[in-house]
A protein has these predicted regions:
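Short periplasmic/luminal acceptor-recognition loop of GT-C membrane glycosyltransferases, typified by
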Residues: 59-94
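Short, structured coil/loop segments at alpha-helix boundaries
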Residues: 9-18, 46-51, 55-58, 79
Length: 163
């Protein structure tokens, strides 16, 4: 849209029209930027994620899996102390490798306990998934639930094959 506007302003002969369009565009950009800045200053979009991130880091749970919307954010909130790979869903446990380090998905990358982090909605939707039945529930706050497994292999063995 901006390149088209530049062509319009270049061809427009009436100075008032050029001024009016430029002023209108400037006002729109300033209002949009102001709204975005105010949103960042007044709303903590990660407020609900902080308690579970602190729990994971504070208890030494340093590797696990979660769905895409939570994985990278928790890693960022813990300054990399907690590494989380992406999965598509808790039933099939297929790796969703978008926007995360490939090392998380390499066999043998992590030795030791592995967790599965789910939202309350995911937990309810996949209540019958083997991973939820076989993992040890170590955290629940009404928003997030964490299940613990002895190893990544144990977690991945809970995957249900797609039909």
């Amino acid at each position: 849209a901006l390149p088209v506007l530049c062509f319009y302003l270049e061809e427009e002969k009436m100075p008032f029209d050029r001024f009016a369009v430029t002023a209108l565009l400037t006002v729109c950009l300033i209002l949009g930027t102001g709204k975005t800045v105010m949103s960042f200053l007044t709303v903590d979009k990660n407020e609900t994620k902080r308690p579970v991130a602190e729990f994971l880091a504070g208890n030494g749970y340093d590797f696990g899996f979660a769905t895409y919307n939570n994985a990278n954010i928790i890693t960022e909130l813990t300054n990399g102390e907690v590494e989380i790979g992406n999965i598509g869903d808790p039933e099939h446990l297929e790796y969703f490798k978008w926007s995360s380090p490939m090392k998380y998905y390499e066999e043998g990358y992590h030795a030791g306990e592995t967790f599965l982090l789910l939202t309350a909605e995911e937990r309810a939707e996949y209540a019958e998934a083997p991973a939820l039945k076989q993992g040890e529930k170590v955290y629940e706050d009404g928003i997030y639930t964490v299940y613990l497994f002895d190893s990544t292999e144990e977690l991945m063995n809970c995957a249900v094959a797609r039909q």
